Design a protein with these regions (language model features):
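Bacterial Sec-dependent signal peptides at the C-terminal "C-region" and cleavage site
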Residues: 15-24
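Outer-membrane beta-barrel "beta-signal"
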Residues: 95, 505-519
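Positively charged n-region of N-terminal signal peptides that target proteins for export
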Residues: 1-4
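Surface-exposed loop and membrane-interface regions of Gram-negative outer-membrane beta-barrel proteins
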Residues: 57-94, 121
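Gram-negative (and chloroplast) outer-membrane scaffold detector with strong preference
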Residues: 89-98, 102-105
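Short glycine/proline- and aromatic-enriched beta-strand/turn motifs that initiate or cap beta-hairpins
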Residues: 23-47
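Signature for the C-terminal beta-barrel architecture of outer-membrane proteins
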Residues: 25, 39, 69-71, 102-103, ...
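Bacterial N-terminal signal peptides
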Residues: 7-16
Length: 519
């Protein structure tokens, strides 16, 4: 593995050091530490940005090693053709051609913030929310001309386009701008890590690094299918006397005819679960000039899938969301958006594919045997009944120094209450905010912070849930071109499936402390 690692580094370093592009390259390096899957790793990184005409390539060449010098092999795996492919594309943070809004724009790699149309389906989606412990190589594409605009995206080429979608927008129909969007997640389980590629995600795989085994009922370290496992359920009774038992030479004799085995974990390669949605939007610009614009629009979307009604226990089709009136405006450095929203029959969520989607994609529950079960985000839509309310958002550039962005969604209607065992009328609110420094001053080179919480009765109570994410990034100049960076991101997972977040064990902290430099 080390031989392959060194060879690739030599090739990449030689490429980006060639005379043809050396003068244009922005070479950034970093040393420091980062938290991955709860463990602290040291890192040495080289992140050159190579511009070639309208193209630009940002590499992410990082080696992680622990206190004992052991290299994290996950990003340098050459054991199979698939692993080699993923290892190579992991070394690219992004490749891009052009810029958003130009005639042609393509970006491959990290998708930090993606919107489709006015955002009824895709709003602020990110495939890099768990970076660097989860590296996704996405794709977004735009083709724009005077009469038609096309935009498409894929969340991760490594998972063979699990999530993808797009939008076609035209003003050629009676002069009215019309857009049609489509999004599908063909297998929602693909969002879970599967280290041994056996189809059983780590969270339900008793042997996450051994693709031969995945089930261990009694937790003794031996697979239920291992010939050396004589007592599958650990009840102290040998299951069967046969030739596996040392010294036994007789005919096979069943001693335990009541073996209580765990259920087989899901195999996501065979048991996929998809969801899709389509949307239509109409917009008309009332005013459109450089310093001021005002557009009114309307949107409607239909989600295609099924979820269980927790009251009737029936499986029902997903619902529709309607925005009969929306207003988007900008005045100088201020951008504003307002929408009136309706969910007439429930089983729908606005901004379904949002910044947190790669975390929300799968949640957890437990069966009567206390075994973890996987629940798709789609299945949670059955908890939403009829709702109506409003959405407002604002973004402002404060003197070229700070950029502030806020949005608030206030819906009220029927939501399923586990405590009461019925649908109850209550609030369903979402709050998102971010603040970033646009221009450094003194020793503070960069700073940003964000907070998001979705679909809770009151996001301002700051009670953590799986829909909560917090983060900040601070860069302080140390002189001589050195910048000390502290990057922190916190999200949450209800691993024990009890409906609440229980302390550190269900808190996902991604922390990076590094000293970056330019050379």
């Amino acid at each position: 593995m080390r031989r392959h690692l060194i060879t690739i580094l030599i090739i990449l370093f030689a490429t980006i050091s060639s005379n043809n592009v050396r003068a244009q390259i922005k070479n950034n390096g970093a040393i420091g530490s980062v938290t991955i899957d709860g463990k602290i790793w040291n890192q040495v990184a080289m992140r050159p940005l190579v511009p070639i005409g309208k193209f630009a390539v940002a590499f992410d060449l990082v080696i992680y090693f622990d206190a004992e010098g052991k290299v994290l092999s996950e990003g340098w795996d050459f054991s199979s053709a698939s692993s080699i492919k993923n290892t190579l594309i992991d070394k690219i943070y992004y490749i891009k051609f052009g810029n958003p809004g130009e005639a042609t724009y393509v970006r491959i790699g990290a998708l930090d913030k993606l919107d489709i149309g006015y955002g009824i389906l895709v709003n602020g989606y990110s495939n890099s929310i768990l970076y660097p412990q989860d590296r996704k190589i996405g794709l977004t594409f735009e083709k724009n001309n005077q009469n038609i605009k096309v935009k498409a995206f894929i969340n991760d080429l490594k998972e063979n386009a699990g999530l993808f979608g797009g939008r076609i927008h035209t003003n050629a129909i009676m002069g009215i701008p019309i857009g049609v969007s489509f999004v599908t997640d063909r297998n929602q389980y693909l969002g879970l890590k599967d280290s041994d590629n056996d189809g059983r995600p780590n969270i339900v795989d008793d042997f996450p690094y051994n693709n031969k085994w995945w089930l261990d009922t009694d937790g003794d370290g031996l697979s239920d299918y291992d010939p050396n496992e004589w007592d599958i359920d650990g009840d102290g009774i040998t299951d069967t006397l046969d030739s596996r038992i040392p010294g036994y030479v007789g005919d096979p004799l069943v001693l335990d005819d009541n073996i209580l085995k765990k259920d087989e974990p899901i195999n996501v390669n065979k048991d996929s679960d998809g969801i899709m949605a389509i949307a239509v939007d109409l917009g008309y610009p009332l005013v459109n000039n450089k310093n001021y614009s005002l557009t009114i629009y309307s949107q409607a979307a239909q989600m295609v899938g099924r979820a269980m009604n927790p009251e009737t226990k029936k499986i029902e089709n997903l619902g529709i969301g309607i925005i009969p009136l929306g207003v988007a405006s900008h005045f100088g450095s201020l951008k504003f958006k307002f929408e009136y929203r309706l969910i007439p029959n429930g089983r729908f969520e606005f901004d379904y594919w949002n910044r947190l989607y790669e975390i929300e994609r799968i949640s957890f529950a437990r069966n009567s045997s206390n075994q973890i079960l996987l629940r798709t985000k789609e299945s949670s839509l059955g908890n939403y009944g009829e709702q109506k309310g409003f959405f407002s958002g604002a973004s402002i550039d404060l003197g070229g120094l700070l950029l502030a962005d806020f949005s608030y969604n206030d819906m009220r209607g029927n939501l399923w209450s586990v405590k009461d065992g019925q649908f109850m009328e209550t609030n369903n609110q979402t709050f998102l905010s971010s603040l970033s420094l646009k221009k450094g001053f003194s020793r503070l080179k960069r700073a940003s912070a964000f907070y998001q919480q979705r679909n809770v009765p009151n996001p301002f109570k700051f009670e953590y849930s799986e829909s909560t994410i917090i983060g900040y990034n601070v860069g302080i100049s140390m002189g001589q071109g050195l910048v000390l960076n502290y990057i922190f991101r916190r999200s949450f997972r209800d691993y024990n499936a009890n409906g609440r977040i229980d302390g550190d064990n269900e808190t996902i902290d991604i922390t990076s402390i590094e000293t970056s430099f330019i050379f």
